[in-house]
Each structure stands twice: as C-alpha cells, then as structure tokens.
C-alpha cells in the first residue's frame, strides 16, 4: 500500500475538483488502491489540460511534450523529474505501462489544432489512446491481465465521454465528429454500446481486484442509450442521468462487481 503523502493528497484534490466522476469511483474503491488510482487520474487530468494551456500551438506542444518526457523517464527506469503528479506516478506505473504515455500524449495533440479526424478508424484510435490507455493503466495496476478486454470496454466508455464533450469541443472550434447528423451520432453511440456488450460478456475473466479500474464506465451504457434514442441531446449538452440515478448506479456496480 502506497502511503498518502503531500503529493498524493494534492493529486486527490486535483481529481476531486477536475474529474468528480472518477473521484467518486476512487472513493468507492478499497482504501488500499486509492493512492495509485489518484496518481493515474491526476496524470490524466494534467495531460488532458496541457493542449489547452495556451492558444499558441508551440507553447501547447511544449506542455504536451513535457509529459511525453515524463513517460520516457518512468519507462526507462531512471530518475524522474520532481513534480507533485509525476513523482507518485513513477512509483505506481511499471515501465511497460509508462510506455503508453507517449501515445496518450500524441493523441492529445489533436486538441491543439482544428483538423478533423481523417476517418472512423482515426477517431477510434484517438479514443483508444486516451480512454483506452487510461483505463488499461488503472486496471493493470490493480491486477488485470486481459488488455484487449479492458480496451474494448474502454472504447464504449470513451465514446460516451466523447459525446458528452462535443459541445465544449465545438465551442472551441474543433471538429470532433465525422458525421454530426442525428443518424451519425446514433450510429457512433451504437458502436459504443456494442463494445460494452462484448466486454461485459467476458466479465467473468477479469480479476475482481481490477474492478475499481473499470468503475469509471458505470454511466456509459445509459449515456449511449440516450444518444441513440435522442441524438439531439449531444449538441444540447444534456446527456446524463439524475444525481440519484448516478449515485445509485455506482453503488450497484460496486456492490455487485458487475462493471
């Protein structure tokens, strides 16, 4: 068990303020696994914010590159620069898991510019390198060994998260969807639902210890079903359930282990 020091306390506070859904899942997890999850999720927040640190592309690129360098330092097993997130992250990640930071950072470069995705495969790859790699980091740190299964589940979660982020991305002059028509949105949401279904069909093969790493997907199915039935909710920014259903859903997933 990794002790909570000042760095991890700061990581937890960062996640609490910046990613309340993932914070809720960590607090629902056993005490002994909270520290590594807070370090991983704090890293994700810092990396996700890096492209938006400046309207000047060169500065934003430098911020993203900083995290690529951190990933390389951790992966190489050498000294890691002092930083309240990077320092505990280095204690949590194996060299192999740290190796994913480079592709995660590369994917985040999309946020710096205003180019659309080339095709559906490019969008899917973006989701896999962001949500997929993040969920694999968390689950693998907690004992998961089936990367393909975790990433399949994460794809569905990532599509749900992506659809919820559409209004903000559009407001920032980005082009997040290949087909923003109602039918196009519904079709994308259906691919997410299918991924969740496929992954959950193999639920029994995942180690129970890894459950907290998959809990951030507890709302995904409900959100995707909304997007299929009412695709206009995406542009309106109204995807999501009530606070009561949100809390009840998380409690159900934790108590039953049915991620």
Briefly describe each language-model feature range.
Residues 111-147:
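Helix-hairpin-helix/helix-loop-helix acidic hairpins
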Residues 1-90, 101-105, 127-136, 146-158, ...:
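Catalytic cores of Mg2+-dependent Asp-rich isoprenoid enzymes
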């Amino acid at each position: 068990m990794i002790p909570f020091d000042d760095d991890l306390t700061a990581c937890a506070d960062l996640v609490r303020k910046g990613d309340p859904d993932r914070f809720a899942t960590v607090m629902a997890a056993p005490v002994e696994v909270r520290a590594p999850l807070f370090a991983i999720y704090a890293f994700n927040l810092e990396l996700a914010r890096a492209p938006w640190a400046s309207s000047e592309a060169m500065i934003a690129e430098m911020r993203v590159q900083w995290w690529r360098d951190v990933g390389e330092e951790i992966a190489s097993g050498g000294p890691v620069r002092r930083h309240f997130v990077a320092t505990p992250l280095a204690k949590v990640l194996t060299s192999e898991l740290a190796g994913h930071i480079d592709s995660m950072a590369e994917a985040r470069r999309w946020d710096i510019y205003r180019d659309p995705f080339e095709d559906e495969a490019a969008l899917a790859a973006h989701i896999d390198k962001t949500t997929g790699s993040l969920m694999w980091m968390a689950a693998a740190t907690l004992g998961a060994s089936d990367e393909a299964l975790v990433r399949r589940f994460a794809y569905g979660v990532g599509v749900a998260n992506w659809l919820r982020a559409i209004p903000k991305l559009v407001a920032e002059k980005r082009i997040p969807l290949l087909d923003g028509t109602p039918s196009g949105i519904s079709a994308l949401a259906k691919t997410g639902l299918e991924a969740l279904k496929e992954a959950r069909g193999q639920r029994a093969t995942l180690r129970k210890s890894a459950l907290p790493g998959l809990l951030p997907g507890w709302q995904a199915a409900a959100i995707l079903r909304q997007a299929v039935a009412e695709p206009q909710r995406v542009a309106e920014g109204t995807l999501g359930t009530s606070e009561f259903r949100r809390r009840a859903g998380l409690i159900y997933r934790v108590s039953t282990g049915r991620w």
